[in-house]
Amino acid sequence: MRLFNWRRQAVLNAMPLVKPDQVRTPWHEFWRRFRRQHMAMTAALFVILLIVVAIFARWIAPYDAENYFDYDNLNNGPSLQHWFGVDSLGRDIFSRVLVGAQISLAAGVFAVFIGAAIGTLLGLLAGYYEGWWDRLIMRICDVLFAFPGILLAIAVVAVLGSGIANVIIAVAIFSIPAFARLVRGNTLVLKQQTFIESARSIGASDMTVLLRHILPGTVSSIVVFFTMRIGTSIISAASLSFLGLGAQPPTPEWGAMLNEARADMVIAPHVAVFPALAIFLTVLAFNLLGDGLRDALDPKIKG
């Protein structure tokens, strides 16, 4: 017995002590994988900077984006006084791009948030209950998927009228089926797991199973898709504004700025270059961030 206790104590002494701060939580594992992706980290920093700029745009902008007019420098290019130049009405393009970030980013995020909320609910119901719930919801999604997203958005705005609020609604509508299908697929897989059967066996209600067990299992997929969908929504909102169906002049929305710049593209290309560059960099950043989140949350599908 003494020999046994001695050996047991020797084994315990040989085991390394694990301090509380050395315990690897899922969050630590996620952060460890994510910070190794330099492109995703750069994109994340850009998105954070963009959000800060959007929040404080009215205070950061050196000039009033809508009511400042420099009639002595119409269509002039970039200078120390006007970093991005001046448009045909004498407005400072740098100030308008900054304030446009506030409008374009808000439109993209709110549209995706609405689409994600409704789509997630429909996907949970379709995947969990199946039967006629599944058939009804999926047939509606099939109908919405039958139309190109921008065409569907144009139709919705044509009915509701122009304006940034209606653009958000239109973009949200064609985001709903994408989230519904994503969540439905995850729900169909999760509902077959043993922990779901265990929850049912102890009398958990359908609402409890959906909200406490199935929904948390779909969060990572939703977050990744949400991030990547923001870029698509920003492009869609800008496209509608470019067509004259979204934000109306003098609102400094990026798509509306491109629409106003069409007449001066030849003599003052900078008027269109900077809003277009803002759209490009923002969409690229959200896509790279989404890729990085996907690889960090589920390293098995990397590559």
UniProtKB/Swiss-Prot annotation:
One of its GO terms (biological process) is glutathione transmembrane transport. The gene is gsiD. Part of the ABC transporter complex GsiABCD involved in glutathione import. Probably responsible for the translocation of the substrate across the membrane. Its main location: membrane. The chain crosses the membrane at residues 40-60, 105-125, 144-164, 165-185, 222-242, 266-286. NCBIfam families: PRK15082.1. Keywords: Cell inner membrane, Cell membrane, Membrane, Transmembrane, Transmembrane helix, Transport. It is found in: Cell inner membrane. Belongs to the binding-protein-dependent transport system permease family. The complex is composed of two ATP-binding proteins (GsiA), two transmembrane proteins (GsiC and GsiD) and a solute-binding protein (GsiB). In the presence of glutathione, interacts with the glutathione-binding protein GsiB. One of its GO terms (molecular function) is glutathione transmembrane transporter activity. GO terms for cellular component: ATP-binding cassette (ABC) transporter complex, substrate-binding subunit-containing; membrane; plasma membrane. The lineage of its organism: Bacteria, Pseudomonadati, Pseudomonadota, Gammaproteobacteria, Enterobacterales. Gene3D superfamilies: MetI-like (1.10.3720.10). InterPro entries: BP-dependent_transpt_permease, MetI-like, MetI-like_sf, OppC_N. CDD domains: TM_PBP2. It comes from Escherichia coli (strain K12). It comes from the Bacteria. It is a multi-pass membrane protein. This is Glutathione transport system permease protein GsiD. It holds the Pfam family BPD_transp_1.
